[in-house]
Amino acid sequence: MKSLKTITIIVLVFFTSHLSFAQKSKPVPDLANVKYGEHERNVLDIWFADKNKITPLVIYIHGGGFDYGNKEKINARPLSRLLKAGISVASINYRYKKIAPLPAAHHDAKKALQFIRSKADSWGIDKDKIGVWGSSAGAQISMWLAFSDDMADAESANPIEKESTRITCVASNIGQTTMESDFWIKHLAKYAPGTEAEFKSKTRLQIYGVENMEEADEIAKSISALALISTDDPPIFMQYFMNPNAIAPSKDNPKKFKGWVIHHVDFGIALKEKMDELNVEAHLKYPSSKTKYNSLVEFLIDKLNKQ
């Protein structure tokens, strides 16, 4: 029998080699750390699917609770699939909430989208075929972009700000469809009783950089997909990793338990119900569901490659 030390070394070598392979397998961006704004985190990477013709584009927005994460977190597999399908991809950084309170991160994403559109001619991007994809906090930002009215400023002296912010489609991975306290308090009371106080604390005020809950609620509503959705909005694909009536994981693993609660399929169900009422196309995938698309990449490819 091999010693425990020998087995440990074998396991470490296996995972190290596979991690190294995964990192090497990710395509190198054609342009890296392109500045789209003034802050040091206002940078993006971009991969061109075909430099010889005009292509659609997907913008990836990373997650991390608005506190961490970066553009390098984009997964190699969906990135490669999109590029192979003839769709260019950009991945952006944005300011964390400790740098600037919400909705600064959202405004950064808007700025990145407008900047990319301003480069459409030189970068070979089809302005009319741009999708957005995000995970967790990045999904929340993505849905805000998708369901907000056009934020182009026709009167601005800055030509970039005149660019449209409307998109073709949006893909959300474990996204929070609302930031409003009423929904969250009920949600937490159902799955994590005793934690609702977080939404009545000074921490929430700091997230939005305000002095009272009324102001916090106003900003939260202004960035929430559930409050923004209207009949003229683009289609969405949402995915979550638990069934609606699934049993929560043990609280003995606080990190896993919290992640399960704040990325719950109930967020997706609430938005899909609202979008169904408005007759706006919405796809919701979870383990036992049946959906038209098997993955968010399949959805993005279908929507952006339509003639």
Feature map (PLM): residue ranges:
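Bacterial Sec-dependent N-terminal signal peptides
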Residues: 1-26
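N-terminal cap/lid segment of alpha/beta-hydrolase-fold proteins
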Residues: 23-53, 230
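Mobile cap/lid helix-loop segments that gate and shape the active-site cleft of serine hydrolases
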Residues: 26, 182-228, 234, 263
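Primarily recognizes the serine-hydrolase "nucleophile elbow" in alpha/beta-hydrolase
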Residues: 31, 114-190
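C-terminal catalytic histidine-bearing segment of alpha/beta-hydrolase fold enzymes
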Residues: 45, 236-246, 250-253, 259-307
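Short beta-strand element of the alpha/beta-hydrolase
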Residues: 54-65
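Short amphipathic alpha-helix adjacent to the substrate-entry channel of hydrolases
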Residues: 71-90
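Alpha/beta-hydrolase active-site loop
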Residues: 100-121
